[in-house]
């Protein structure tokens, strides 16, 4: 399971270290806001007016209020996946290609 967290841990750690405000969307649609105080394999401690322990299995999406650098040690690896400008165009083109094939 350590391989699966090679992107998650550096991302959450950067959000925690830089105290970036985040919106966390749960699978039931509820939106939580605050700063990540700490996290482990199963939970994120989210601090706003109160601290909330949020179980990761209930989380759909974590949205930072600003871009965060979370580079890992692997050169040229998948560490830049967060940048919006690089990912927006190819995914829309790919979905259009699949529509044309039908």
From Swiss-Prot:
Gene3D superfamilies found in the cross-reference section: 2.30.30.100
Q: Share an example GO biological-process annotation for this protein.
A: regulation of DNA-templated transcription
Name listed for the protein in its UniProt record: RNA-binding protein Hfq
Low complexity composition-biased segments: 70-96
A Pfam family cross-referenced in the UniProt record is Hfq
> What GO molecular function annotations does the UniProt record carry, in alphabetical order?
RNA binding
Q: How does it assemble?
A: Homohexamer.
Where in this protein does the record put region Disordered? 63-102
Q: Which NCBIfam families match?
A: Hfq, PRK00395.1
Q: Which InterPro entries match?
A: Hfq (IPR005001), LSM_dom_sf (IPR010920), Sm (IPR047575)
Signal peptide range: none
Query: What's the stated role of this polypeptide?
Result: RNA chaperone that binds small regulatory RNA (sRNAs) and mRNAs to facilitate mRNA translational regulation in response to envelope stress, environmental stress and changes in metabolite concentrations. Also binds with high specificity to tRNAs.
Q: Which family does it belong to?
A: Belongs to the Hfq family.
Which organism was this protein described from? Cronobacter sakazakii (strain ATCC BAA-894)
UniProtKB keywords: RNA-binding, Stress response
GO terms for CC? cytosol
Sm domain mapped to chain residues? 9-68
| Entry keyword annotation includes RNA-binding | yes
